[in-house]
Amino acid sequence: MALSSNSGATWTPHPGAPNGVAGGKVAISADGTSILWSTGNNRILVSGTTAEFTDVGSLPSGSTIASDKKDASTFYGASGSSFYISRDAGRTFSRGGTLGSSYSPYKIVAHPTVAGDVWVSTNTGLFHSTNFGATFNAISNVSQAWAIALGAPSGSDKYPAIFAVAKVSGTGGVYRSDNAGVSIPSPRGALFSNASS
């Protein structure tokens, strides 16, 4: 585990990282003071930028993780069909809404400027919450979503464009929605029947 404060030009080892632990995914709080780490050996750890990492027992091992991009105290996690929320900078998590019948949540993406607005791509579809993950709405006609990202909106003062590698109405492809998933036009790019997250 290493940290950079200059856009990746240089890196400094985290002084509190445990020995022999590597890999996995990291989520950093909106203010940069808290780090949540889903490690390569399926541990869930949390720390500040200098303190020793401690295990998070209230989030299942191997969970998909993310941070809210506006609320520095909020982190998200997903495991199976369950979604989890932390309001204390990743120290503890409580269960929130459900992700249908999903068993593989692939990615959690938070709105860049609106707290509590979060998306989850899973093996059974694409899910959206506007209340910090307390409840979710499934996006219509999406039966599988391997990846999701939010990008620049099509015009000023609009919701971010949603890009998804997904299966919509039975057709796999790269899709874009410009109205928060209300409608998803024909796919952009190559079509396919399967993909990997």
Region locations from a protein language model:
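Conserved blade-ending motifs and adjacent loop-strand segments that build the rim/top face
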Residues: 102, 140-149, 183-197
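Structural signature of eukaryotic scaffold interfaces centered on beta-propeller domains
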Residues: 25-31, 64-70, 107-114, 147-157, ...
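Beta-propeller fold detector
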Residues: 12-16, 54-58, 94-98, 137-141, ...
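Hydrophobic beta-strand positions in blades of beta-propellers and related beta-sheet-rich domains
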Residues: 1, 41-45, 83, 126-127, ...
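Loop/turn-rich, solvent-exposed surfaces of beta-rich toroidal or solenoidal domains
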Residues: 112-114, 121-127, 137-179
